[in-house]
């Protein structure tokens, strides 16, 4: 009975786990060392289409029709023996072809192992070394398909003494001191699987898209799509998610693995990640995208819909509403500032006109005051009322004023001043003359 109960319990647990992971496929954690190369924030309006860019030309897959001529090794030497100080290509070899020696002098003197791309040993053998062979040699490995380039440098010195022959490391490169006339081997060994064996590349290239809802950690992200270079595609989740999130069929041909999300909704917010795995080339990259959904901006318009005059006759048995529909939407800020500018300009013009009117009024009032003063002097002042009393002058005339003068001229002038002849002065006549002028 206990064993039967345990079996039933295990069956229930298995059923629960299958139900839980039916719509939530966890992300692949087999490559925790994926390098995060970019983090982007993407905002899109609700109802639109969002494109999460994920491109890598190192992931472009092309069928190798040249028997894998994309791997090559070549040896170069930098020599100062002839004083020209130049780099010279010695030999090269493709993974599917024979090695090629560039100089006729080196034919039969230098060579690499024929099984170099199988064994991973790319060492260069030089027979009957001479002083002209001294220099800095470089072993260059190129993988054009994976965009990998590796270089190993070795310095070769020639000596005529057997005791001086040795090998050591100078901190940057290996140094070999070889006896003149002997055979020397410059080591270059790389047994990485990229250089030694050929994999089925389309089975080792895969792209994953994962999604993390807000608050969900990376290790519990949901898998959306798996896409292999062979053309196999796996989509996860409900049908509506598989229909709205997709990658183009030419992804591996163009290196464009961008995810397109159609008809965005608020539930589509979260963290998306694009995982690029090229196991053959050792490429493991991850790109992260923070997706935010915003509300669309509505255009503000004023729409007036009116019916035409040629409407059919109104049926009295049918209750109808109004024929005019007015839809008023708040105006934009630009229109508000335009109206405000018109109002301010009108007020400014009114103030200028008011200032001009006040100035003219004050001028007219000043002219009126001057006119009243002249008129008042003409009407109210009667010069006849003023009389000149000359009785007092006779007193000064009769008086005998004796003054001491320095000469006769001053005395005569003083006597003339004391004599005031009687004269009648008509003041009214003189004032009238002045006024008429």
UniProtKB/Swiss-Prot annotation:
This is Matrix remodeling-associated protein 8. Transmembrane protein which can modulate activity of various signaling pathways, probably via binding to integrin ITGAV:ITGB3. Mediates heterophilic cell-cell interactions in vitro. It is a single-pass type I membrane protein. Disulfide bonds join 54-139, 188-274. One of its GO terms (cellular component) is cell surface. Residues 32-159, 167-294 form the Ig-like V-type domain. Keywords: Cell adhesion, Cell membrane, Disulfide bond, Glycoprotein, Immunoglobulin domain, Membrane, Repeat, Signal, Transmembrane, Transmembrane helix. The chain crosses the membrane at residues 340-360. Homodimer in cis. Does not appear to form trans-homodimers. Glycans are attached at residues 41, 121, 246, 304. The keyword Signal applies. It comes from Gallus gallus (Chicken). Residues 1-22 form the signal peptide. The gene is MXRA8.
């Amino acid at each position: 009975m206990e064993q039967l109960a345990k079996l039933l319990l295990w069956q229930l647990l298995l059923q629960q786990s299958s139900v839980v992971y039916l719509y939530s496929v966890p992300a692949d954690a087999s490559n925790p060392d994926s390098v995060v190369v970019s983090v982007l924030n993407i905002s899109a309006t609700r109802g639109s289409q969002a494109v999460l860019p994920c491109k890598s030309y190192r992931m472009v897959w092309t069928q190798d029709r040249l028997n894998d001529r994309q791997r090559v090794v070549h040896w170069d030497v930098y020599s100062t023996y002839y004083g020209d100080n130049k780099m010279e290509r010695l030999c090269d070899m493709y993974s599917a072809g024979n090695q090629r020696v560039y100089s006729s002098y080196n034919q039969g003197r230098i060579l690499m192992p024929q099984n170099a791309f199988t064994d991973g040993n790319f060492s260069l053998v030089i027979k009957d070394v001479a002083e002209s062979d001294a220099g800095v040699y470089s072993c260059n490995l190129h993988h054009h398909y994976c965009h990998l380039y590796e270089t190993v440098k070795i310095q070769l010195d020639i000596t005529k003494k057997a005791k001086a022959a040795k090998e050591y490391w100078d901190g940057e490169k290996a140094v070999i001191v070889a006896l003149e006339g002997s055979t020397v081997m410059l080591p270059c060994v790389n047994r990485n699987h990229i250089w030694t064996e050929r994999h089925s590349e389309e089975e080792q290239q895969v792209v994953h898209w994962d999604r993390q809802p807000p608050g969900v950690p990376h290790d519990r992200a949901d898998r959306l799509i798996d896409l292999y270079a062979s053309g196999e595609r796996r989509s996860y989740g409900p049908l509506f998610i598989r229909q709205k999130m997709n990658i183009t069929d030419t992804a591996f041909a163009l290196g464009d693995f961008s995810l397109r999300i159609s008809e965005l909704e608020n539930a589509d917010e979260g963290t998306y990640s694009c995982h690029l795995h090229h196991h053959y080339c050792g490429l493991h990259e991850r790109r992260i995208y923070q997706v935010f959904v915003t509300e669309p901006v509505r255009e503000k318009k004023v729409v007036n819909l009116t019916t035409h005059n040629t409407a059919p006759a109104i049926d009295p048995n049918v209750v109808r509403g109004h024929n005019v529909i007015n839809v008023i939407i708040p105006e934009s800020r630009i229109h508000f500032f335009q109206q405000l500018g018109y109002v301010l300009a009108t007020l400014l013009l009114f103030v200028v006109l008011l200032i001009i009117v006040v100035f003219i009024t004050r001028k007219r009032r000043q002219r009126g005051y001057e006119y009243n003063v002249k008129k008042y002097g003409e009407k109210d002042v009667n010069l006849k009322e003023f009389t000149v009393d000359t009785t007092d002058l006779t007193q000064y005339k009769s008086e005998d004023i004796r003054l001491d003068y320095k000469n006769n001229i001053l005395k005569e002038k003083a006597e003339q001043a004391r004599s005031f002849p009687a004269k009648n002065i008509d003041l009214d006549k003189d004032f009238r003359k002045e006024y008429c002028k």
